Amino acid sequence: MKHTLYSIILLFFIKIVSTYAQEDPLTTPRKDRLNDFTQLKVYSGILVNLIPSDENKAIIYGDRYGSIRVRQKGNTLKLRMRFGELFYYHNTYVDLYFKSPLHVVKLHQGASVQTEAPLSQSKFLLKAHEGAQFEGTLETEYLVTKVRTGAQVSLRGETSEHILKVSTGGVCEARNLKSERTQVCVFAGGEVGIFSDTQVEAHVSMGGTIGIQGKPKSVIARRTIAGEIYSQNQNTNRSYSKRNSRRNFNRFN
C-alpha cells in the first residue's frame, strides 16, 4: 500500500515538474508570424537580434515574454512591453527574422538591437535615444545615424555617405565603419569616433568630442563654445585647427 502511495506521489511530482518545464519561456519561446515590414521601433529595454531570412517572424523568450506587445501598422513593426511591465524588462529577448530590407530602426527606453548578419541596402536611418543600444554591420550607400540622451551605437561595415548627429551624452563608435564622405555634428557631451580616408565635415560644440581615424584628404572642422576634434591614428596627437565651414549644418536638425 505504501509502495503504491509513494508511486502515485512520485508520478504526480514528475507531472508537475514536466508541466513547469514545458511552460518555461526560456525553453518554450513564443512564436509570432509577421507581415512584411521595413521600419522597426523597439521600446522598454527589449533585446532584439536581427536575422535576415526568407520569412517574417518573431521568436520571443525570457522573463515576462508574454508581456511583449507586437504591433504592425503599415510597414512599421513596434515591439514594447505592456505598460504595467515597464520595470521588468531586463531579460526579455526577441529573435526577429525579416525578408524585406530594413530602412528605418528607432530605439527607445533602453532597448538593445544587434545584427546577426550585415544589413545590405541602399539607405538606412538609425535613431537611438534614452539609453538604447545598437551594434551591427552595415553595407549601405547612404546612412543617417542620430544618437542622443545616453544611447550608444557601434557600427561596422561600409557606406558611401554617413550623416551623423550625436548629442546629450550619446556615443557613436564608428571607427570600423569605412565611409567615403562623413558629415558629423556633435554637441552637449556627445562622443564620436569615425574612420575616413576621403572627406570629413565635423562640427562640435558645448563639450562634444570627435575622433577621426584614417587619413582623410579633406577635413573641414568647426568648433563652437567648446569641444574637440582630433586624430585617433596611432602615435598621432593632432588636434584639427578651427576652420569655419561654409556648408550649412542645418540638415542635421
Name each region found by the language model:
Residues 1-253:
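Intrinsically disordered, low-complexity terminal regions
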